[in-house]
Amino acid sequence: MLIFFIVLICAVAIYYLISLRYRWIVLLVASVTFYAIISTYLTPFICLTAVSVWLCAAYIQRQNDSSADVKTTKKKNKTAMLLTILLNIGIIAFLKFYSPFAALLNSVFEKVNFDAQIPSLKLILPLGISFYTLQAIGYLIDVYRKKIIAEKNFFKVALFLCFFPQILEGPIAKYDQTAAQLYEGHKFDYKTVAFGAQRILWGLFKKMIVADRLYLLVKTVSDKPSEYAGIASLLLILFYTLQLYADFSGFIDIAIGSAEMFGIKLPENFRQPFFAKSAQEFWQRWHISLGVWLKEYVFYTVALSPRLMKFCGKLKKKHKNHFTKILPTLVSLFFVWLCNGLWHGAKWNYIVYGMYYFVIISSGMICEPLFKKLYAAMKINPDGKAISIFRHIRTLFIIFIGETIFGAGSLKNAWITLSSVFKPWKGSMFSLGLDYKEFIVAIIGIITIFTADFIKEKGVNIRESIAMKKLPARWLCYISIIVAIVLFGAYGGMYSLLPFIYGNF
């Protein structure tokens, strides 16, 4: 974290001192420096991705520009694209799945008395590989689809893939969203830099006051879930989800704020997710950039595939009903949620997590006509306040259960935690890692975050509102959040410096 801010401060200072034409080079040098310091000997992996994607995109562009035979060109381009995508997916799949797969096979061999052993390797994931790989693949597919023109300059492609504010945890950006901003150079604007700094402070508030504090209780209970029940299990379910939100959205605030200090606008990744009224809406508000990527490059790829369209077309002619109408969507959603689970890692709980949301969302789509008939029969207004409140509460239950599956470490631990909520437990909730005072600080922090989310949900731009106030009032807000971070940030003593959760993916 310290290295990140040192690089950021130096980069901002130098960025605005040199010519506009060369400012993108400052971003590249800062990004490469940061990545090399943090990832050290794993840096060649991102270099391989950048080189392979740059070469393939250049080849596709050259074929499009020079060849008159459209059919042959498309076939060659598709082959080149698929080989490059397979190379990059192969790298991440090997690094993520080799060790768990080897361990699984070795355990099977042992049980059947098969005299063989797959060597175990201590593999470490390169920094941000899950994020920059998706950006690279998205860029390549967009060039293939002729949505964008391939960038000729390798170093500009490298900057797009390794821009240091977003390399750790995203947000995952499409080339046409950020490339021009990265390359063009921006004039100094006090408001833009100040707004960026404010966004960073808000991210630090979420991370240091809420996420890292909740971690103490989460770790205490999740390390030995079978020893706890009742309120302890319930707090684990609630606090892990809130910790994940504060941690992940906190980093995104830092990333977006850091980019904003250069005049660069990254895509938002969260939009008040806990105000959603359905699981589908939740995923339109949570980890938005991943959802957009999966929709653009997995959902539409499957839904518009000739084989699926042909099969569903024949089925619709024989059986004209609601299910056959939505079947292409359901098949596409299955692959989207499978990819979502696999993207997070090789654990079964990640795959079940993806399938959990697939079942929830697809069930809602399948049963939609039934719900409409039920509302009509019972004379219930589906847009009424009572139904709206019910949907909101139902969605919160779905979210908390889903995130428990996600964060439990194993399906066994997830089941133990969820099934223990209604069992008696005689301990005190203040013996779970947070004493009374720390618990109160955590709750106040959570209330502050959700108050801000509520205000934003009402359409109020908080930063603009603060900026319109008189100077003393503005600085009172800024100083208050700085003092809060300094006084109540979770560092020193019983706290340790914690990495961002999604940095592990």
Locations of the language-model features?
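Membrane-embedded transmembrane alpha-helical bundles that form the catalytic cores
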Residues: 2-504
